[in-house]
Amino acid sequence: MNKSYCIKLFSEIFSDSASKYRFCCHANENDTTKKYNPLNTTPFDYFLSPEMEQIRNDVLSGKRIQGCEECYLKEDAGHESFREQYNQGKDLPTNVESYNVDLKMHIFGTFCNLGCYMCIPFDSSTRRAELQKSGLKDFWYDMESADYTLEGPRNLGTKRYEEIEANLIANIDYIRILRFYGGEPIQMPRVWSLLSKIPKDKAKNIEVLISTNLTLTEFKGYSIEWIKERFKKLTLTVSVDHYGKKLHWIRYPINVFEFEKNLALYKKDVNYLNIAVSMLNVYDLKEIEQHYN
């Protein structure tokens, strides 16, 4: 395939915390598509729009597109880019295909039951409340490098979320993977609202990936086990920054015993442990690895 093609343009719908559609989490905005956002355009109306079709045609013809500068700069400097990593070893589609779309949208909320020290505040309601209470919110935002983070999280509102959810269900045959991240998805009502509305025969074709703190495994009659029984596959990416007393201090107010019990119970469903490296754990990384092995 040519040096501008990227599989993400054909297989991923991504929106960030500021309710902006982008080609992937590494991409900048594109002038032709930035008019679309989850507040005014449903996911598949954006993804199947004439503008997105033109962008896909452009990369198929070898044209570089606005928004993908980070990858192009890496490649021009002789380094491997995210684009090249994503394309590697994959069947590369040339159009939008059924059961091939990876949905990764920040539309389900930011509620989280922990206030982790390394957490970006727009990804955790608890951390955000703590920083606001302590007067450190502006200081934290000043440390962010991406412009979109300055805008903070946007609440879609119930009516708008229901419209988006209906659009996803209507186009469920396109979806291969549902990714839930930001906050604690297992404790978000909207996550379970979407999952429960997907017909059983369709769910069997869909993989679910959840980025979780794994402190809780159930929510109002739903559970991790319910997902495993209903969907094709469940994958858990588990956030963990230390162990024992240090874990409790960093990821306050985590119940370490319950967390490690859940981790052992769902070990086979975990693809990796996600560690936020900071001065609070950087000298203990080998020790942490040995503990969880």
Enumerate the predicted regions with their spans:
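Catalytic cores of alpha/beta
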Residues: M279-N293
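A short acidic, amphipathic alpha-helical/loop segment
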Residues: N167, R190-K197, G221-W226, W249, ...
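Short pre-active-site segment immediately N-terminal to redox-active cysteine/selenocysteine motifs
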Residues: G67, E75, F111-G115, F122-D123
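Core AdoMet radical
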Residues: N100-F111, I120-R160, D173-V191, D201-G221, ...
